[in-house]
């Protein structure tokens, strides 16, 4: 038995798991095989616990399928694989990158639990403006299925900056928590290393600083400032679009930071390759580390957000009221918090108790607008236009995938975005049974986990219908 056994496991896991999960949890592992024991080394305790909880059965099953009764025992450790005398024994889960990336990516040290972070040079002379908001932490970020991977990735970066997930690219619609996670990472890094030079900014600030440096003949100072930070957190990178000089400077800054194992975190409202007006070489680099989507919060998360926000304001919010608001306002966290602030303000001004009837009155115009915007008819038209088919196709008996999948998507959206029952949704789709609607909803939920394209389609349609 040889260490190629772990490589076989990696190949199978890469085929079986979504790309994001494999990159986030399996790729950072290192392996050592001795005395019929396979030791897997995780970069930190968080990764170790997650892999053991979520993937232990998968890995043991693969070991048994490859080795039968001779399958090695599995052991988990935090840290890096001990150095051995035989170089070829060093086996990690670093699956080969595409050829074009290998040709263009700058050379840098292999990630480890230290990641070169403790060897960062002493602070240079610039005065750093952190701009990190201390109020945004991981503790007050409400986690749900829609943002679980993004939060986990951000947590790992905060614990191990400059490591396997560099750069970290978070994308999703407005008001979903991307900025909160940026600040949470910054706070996490500085809690671990108080003297760390962590800089948060909107992409437009980078552009403004560069323009000012050019005007003042201070471009070298500009370069020194941005290339000597320990972590650079840039929000809304899509605003670099069509700014060629800024993109050129950021390209070189990006390379310099990566070569120094300095952490980069970027956010955008769309997937990197879909950002128009940004050079391909930059978009390619955005995907070198880990790219994670944040989706609109599902119902349970929306309720949790409202309850937590109310608790922070020392407001008693009945569960049924939180559910009522969450069921009707679905687009993003910012909208939810704004609606709750409005309810709280009205309650304070009038001295009335917060009930469903009170909320219905306080949010009357907002709820009316939502109900007007999101109807089954509107969903059908939007989905048909998105997939370039006819509304009549969605209502027909046709079962070809080109029609069936959009129909399932439309049904799932109707369940998510309206208050109609399953039988009512079925009636609106050509008189179908409620079990057909339920199957469609479950199918789309499954495909969102397995298919990046379906996940993107769902997010894009939610964004369109909720805007």
UniProtKB/Swiss-Prot annotation:
Region annotated Domain II, chain positions: 91-130
Main subcellular localisation: cytoplasm
Compositional bias ranges of the Low complexity kind: 98-111
Molecular-function GO terms, alphabetical: ATP binding; ATP hydrolysis activity; DNA replication origin binding; lipid binding
CDD domains documented for this protein: AAA (cd00009), Bac_DnaA_C (cd06571)
Binding site for ATP: 175, 177-179
Domain III, AAA+ region: annotated segments: 131-347
Record-linked InterPro entries: AAA+_ATPase (IPR003593), Chromosome_initiator_DnaA (IPR001957), Chromosome_initiator_DnaA-like (IPR020591), Chromosome_initiator_DnaA_CS (IPR018312), DnaA_C (IPR013159), DnaA_dom (IPR013317), DnaA_N_dom (IPR024633), DnaA_N_sf (IPR038454)
Cell compartments where the protein resides: Cytoplasm
Cited Gene3D superfamilies: 1.10.1750.10, 1.10.8.60, 3.30.300.180, P-loop containing nucleotide triphosphate hydrolases
Region described as Disordered: spans on this chain: 98-119
Annotated segments matching region Domain I, interacts with DnaA modulators: 1-90
GO biological processes: DNA replication initiation; regulation of DNA replication
Start and end residues of each stretch annotated as Domain IV, binds dsDNA: 348-467
Swiss-Prot/TrEMBL keywords: ATP-binding, Cytoplasm, DNA replication, DNA-binding, Lipid-binding, Nucleotide-binding
Entry function: Plays an essential role in the initiation and regulation of chromosomal replication. ATP-DnaA binds to the origin of replication (oriC) to initiate formation of the DNA replication initiation complex once per cell cycle. Binds the DnaA box (a 9 base pair repeat at the origin) and separates the double-stranded (ds)DNA. Forms a right-handed helical filament on oriC DNA; dsDNA binds to the exterior of the filament while single-stranded (ss)DNA is stabiized in the filament's interior.
Protein name: Chromosomal replication initiator protein DnaA
Organism (species): Shigella boydii serotype 18 (strain CDC 3083-94 / BS512)
Lineage start: Bacteria, Pseudomonadati, Pseudomonadota, Gammaproteobacteria, Enterobacterales
Gene from which the chain derives: dnaA
């Amino acid at each position: 038995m040889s260490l190629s056994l772990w490589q076989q496991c990696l190949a199978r896991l890469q085929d079986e798991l979504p790309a994001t999960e494999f990159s986030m949890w399996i790729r950072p592992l290192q392996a050592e095989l001795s005395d019929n024991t396979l030791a897997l080394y995780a970069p930190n305790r968080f990764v170790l616990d997650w892999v053991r909880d979520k993937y232990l059965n998968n890995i043991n099953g693969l070991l048994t399928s490859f080795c039968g009764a001779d399958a090695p025992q599995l052991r988990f450790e935090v840290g890096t694989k001990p150095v051995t005398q035989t170089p070829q024994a060093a086996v990690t889960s670093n699956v080969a990158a595409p050829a074009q990336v290998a040709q263009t990516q700058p050379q840098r040290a292999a990630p480890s639990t230290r990641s070169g972070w403790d060897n960062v040079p002493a602070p240079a002379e610039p005065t750093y403006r952190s701009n990190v908001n201390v109020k945004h932490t991981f503790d007050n970020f409400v986690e749900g299925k829609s943002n679980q991977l993004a939060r986990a990735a951000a947590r790992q970066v905060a614990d191990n900056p400059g490591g396997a997930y560099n750069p970290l690219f978070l994308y999703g619609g407005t008001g979903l928590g991307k900025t909160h996670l940026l600040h949470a990472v910054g706070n996490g890094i500085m809690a671990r290393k108080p003297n760390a030079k962590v800089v948060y900014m909107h992409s437009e600030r980078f552009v403004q600083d560069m323009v000012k440096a050019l005007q003042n003949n201070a471009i070298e100072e500009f370069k020194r400032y941005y290339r000597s930070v320990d972590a650079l957190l840039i929000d809304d990178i899509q605003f670099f679009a069509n700014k060629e000089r800024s993109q050129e400077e950021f390209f070189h800054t990006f390379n310099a930071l990566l070569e120094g194992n300095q952490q980069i975190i970027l956010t955008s409202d769309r997937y990197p390759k879909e950002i128009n007006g940004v050079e391909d070489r930059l978009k390619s680099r955005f995907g070198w580390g880990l790219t994670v989507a944040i989706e609109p919060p599902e119902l349970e998360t929306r309720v949790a957000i409202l309850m937590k926000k109310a608790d922070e304001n020392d407001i008693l919010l009945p569960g049924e009221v939180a559910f009522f608001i969450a069921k009707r306002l679905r687009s993003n966290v910012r909208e939810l918090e704004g609606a709750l602030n409005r309810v709280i303000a009205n309650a304070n001004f009038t001295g009335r108790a917060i009930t469903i009837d009170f909320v219905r009155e306080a949010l009357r115009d907002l709820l009316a607008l939502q109900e007007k915007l999101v109807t089954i008819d509107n969903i059908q038209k939007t989905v048909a236009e998105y997939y370039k088919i006819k509304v009549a196709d969605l209502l027909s008996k046709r079962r070809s995938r080109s029609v069936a999948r959009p129909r399932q998507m439309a049904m799932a959206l109707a369940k998510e975005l309206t208050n109609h029952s399953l039988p009512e949704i079925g009636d609106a789709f050509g008189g179908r049974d409620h079990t057909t609607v339920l199957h469609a909803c479950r199918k789309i939920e499954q495909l969102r986990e397995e298919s990046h394209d379906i996940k993107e389609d769902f997010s894009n349609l939610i964004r369109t219908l909720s805007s």
